[in-house]
Structures are given as C-alpha cells and as structure tokens.
Amino acid sequence: IVPRRGFSCSQLAMPFLKDKLKTFHNFASSTLETIYTPSRLAESKKYEVNTLEHSVLMNEAGHFKLINLPREAQIAPSFGSELIDIDDDGVLDIILAHNFFSPQRETGRMDGGLSLALKGNGDCTYTPLPHSVSGISISGDTRRVIAIDLDGNGIKEIAFAQNNGPMIIYSKKR
C-alpha cells in the first residue's frame, strides 16, 4: 500500500511528515507503514468504496438493487441530479450536472462532461440523449441542477448552477 496524496498535500495536512521524510523522493519511496507506523494504521478508521459509478437504487420489495447508469454518465463527476419527465411520456428522466474543476492539484481537472439528459425507460434503466437532441451542453464546472417553473407558466425550466460561472437555464420547446 502506498500513499494516495502527494507530499505537498500530505505535509500541509500533517506537518510532521516534512520533518520525518524531508524530501519528495523519501515520501515517494515510502509505504504507508513506514510513514505512519503499523500501530497508527491499525488504530485508524478505514473506509471502503464498493462502486464509483453514477447509479440508481431500485426498491424491490424491501431491498435495493443497484443499477449503474450508462457509460456516458460516468465521463465526469456529477454534483447534481434532477428527476423530471422531460419528454412528457409519464416516465421520469434524469438530468446530471457534470464536471469538477478544482480537485487536489495532483488529481487534475475532471472536465470531460457536458452535463447530460438520460431518458427513463420505465424500468430504472436510462438511455443517454445526445446533446444535439436534448440541447443540454455545458462545459463549465456545474454544481447543481434543479427543475423549477421560473416563469409561472406551469412548465418547469431546468436551471444549472456553475462554480464561478453564470446560471444556465433551459426551457422546453413548445
């Protein structure tokens, strides 16, 4: 096991590392056990990630079934999602707000998404709509999406909030 974070980030969070390891080379060639000691690691909290995919949970008579969203939904992190029937077929669709421009320096920007509309198939599976069909195409650092009737006409608009960017609002074609 090796450290996940780089030396710069780690020593800012834990200043003792700078004195203990002194150089980037020493940090890079160390294992977690040599940095933190086996006893410290044994005492530490441990978390396990079972999936990183964007998913939905379907309630099947008291237990939940995890269903991963299509590959297009996995292109970038999503900090916001909204359920709305965008095509008036009686089935809820999903809108995702994609991208993350400010992770840790050593991770780099996660900016491969344009946000995404997923058409519900009625069985907790979803089909991605091309951006040319949905009209949704946002290359910014979106943080939230909400469906809200902004003009009082009974039809919900889809509003995207961006980090350090303008709000973008989409309306249904009439």
Show where each model-derived region lies.
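Beta-propeller-forming repeat regions
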Residues: 1-174
